[in-house]
Amino acid sequence: MRIDIMTLFPDTVGDVLSESILGRAQERGILRIETHQIRDYTANRQNQVDDYPYGGGHGAVLQADPLYRCWCHVCDEAGAPVHTIYLSPAGHVFDQSDARRLAKMDNLVFVCGHYEDRKSVV
C-alpha cells in the first residue's frame, strides 16, 4: 500500500508516521508513506498557499492551484488510480468501517489543510 500525504508540515507528519506500527510496516516494505509540501507547488515567490474566502468571512482558506498541482504530481508518481481524502474538522468521523474499506485500497492520498476550509473549486 502507498499513502501520500499533502501537507504544509511534511517533516512533522513524516516523523510521526515513521514510528510504531507504521514505521515497522514501512521497514518491512508493506507500506510506503510519502509526504509532499504543498508550498512547493505555488506560483509565487513567497510560496503563499492561503487566500481569503470568496464573499468574505473569517479566517483563511487554501488556494486551489497549489493543491491541484501537488495532487497531480502525487497521481503521476503513484502511477495508478488514487483515492483522495480531504481531512477536515467539518467532515465525517473516521471509524473502523472506514479503516477496513481503506485498507483494501492500493493508493491513498490524504490532503491535510490545516485551515478552516479550502477553495470550493478544489
Q: Model-found features: residue ranges?
A:
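N-terminal nucleotide/polyanion-binding subdomain common to many enzyme families
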Residues: 1-75
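S-adenosyl-L-methionine/SAH cofactor-binding core of RNA-modifying enzymes
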Residues: 63-112
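Conserved small/polar residues in nucleotide/adenosyl-binding loops
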Residues: 120-122
